[in-house]
Amino acid sequence: MLDKKMSIATLKAKKGIEKITAITAYDALMARIFDGEVDVILVGDSLKMSFGGENETLGASMQEMIYHTKAVCKGAKHSFIIADMPFGSYATPNMALKNALRFYKNTAADALKLEVGIDKLPVVKVLCEEGIAVMAHIGLKPQFMRFDGGFKIKGKDEVESQELIEAAVAFQEAGVFGILIEGVKSESGARITQALEIPTIGIGAGVECDGQILVWSDAFGFFDEFKPKFVRRYCDGKAILKDAIRAYAKDVKSQAFPQAQESY
């Protein structure tokens, strides 16, 4: 349990010493539950899938991301809060800076995460030069799933692995404080992590990353239509809530609820 606000300096100091823990959240309620139990809370555009029922993340808007980030910031006072910049909000350096400043002015997010390839290096540089804390997201990038033809594992061979390493190093030199690595072969995840002085957080990128993150509804069994290989379920949350709602409905129908102690 964190007893004070997590910082970039503390996250960087954990590299090679203690694994970084991270989870997603999209509202104040879940943020309060997770706050201080993990180092990082990510307000991911994955909310369009796990929260909005869609099959991709591309529909997330700036307005939605700001709304959910504000909610999470109200609920979490100790964990480090990172917000995703949605698809289309950082196509050019000027657009990226305008939208990043909008995030910073309208939320209490500690940092922003961008899904980027090496072509977006100018975007990353502009944000870092303006004092905006940036995490670069490399490997499998859900915002580009249409371009890639689906969710495809990266870093499968030496060429892909080396390209990811070179991109990660370039982003480090541009000023990012960390790298999120998604959906890459474990060996590539390890090589990227070893090549960097800044921490890496993995999701489906192997145990050698400096930290791990999962989508909360995957980790706690609220989404069971599909389970990626990298997900471990820590409880069957869907079944727990199903039992609870059925018990509630049964009590209402049988007039077992409310009773005298629950009435004015």
Curated annotation (Swiss-Prot):
Residues involved in Mg(2+) binding: 45, 84, 115
CDD domains registered for this protein in UniProt: KPHMT-like (cd06557)
Cofactor(s) of this protein: Mg(2+)
One Gene Ontology biological process: pantothenate biosynthetic process
Domain of life: Bacteria
GO molecular function, one term: magnesium ion binding
Pathway: Cofactor biosynthesis; (R)-pantothenate biosynthesis; (R)-pantoate from 3-methyl-2-oxobutanoate: step 1/2
Subcellular location: Cytoplasm
Catalytic activity from the UniProt record: 3-methyl-2-oxobutanoate + (6R)-5,10-methylene-5,6,7,8-tetrahydrofolate + H2O = 2-dehydropantoate + (6S)-5,6,7,8-tetrahydrofolate
Annotated catalytic residues: 182
Enzyme class label: transferase
Assigned keywords, A-Z: Cytoplasm, Magnesium, Metal-binding, Pantothenate biosynthesis, Transferase
GO cellular component: cytoplasm
Binding site for 3-methyl-2-oxobutanoate: 45-46, 84, 113
Enzyme Commission number(s) from the entry: 2.1.2.11
Coarse class of the protein's main subcellular location: cytoplasm
Pfam families: Pantoate_transf
Co-factor: note: Binds 1 Mg(2+) ion per subunit.
Subunit note: Homodecamer; pentamer of dimers.
Similarity annotation: Belongs to the PanB family.
Role this protein plays: Catalyzes the reversible reaction in which hydroxymethyl group from 5,10-methylenetetrahydrofolate is transferred onto alpha-ketoisovalerate to form ketopantoate.
PANTHER family: 3-METHYL-2-OXOBUTANOATE HYDROXYMETHYLTRANSFERASE
Name of the protein described by the UniProt record: 3-methyl-2-oxobutanoate hydroxymethyltransferase
Lineage, opening ranks: Bacteria, Pseudomonadati, Campylobacterota, Epsilonproteobacteria, Campylobacterales
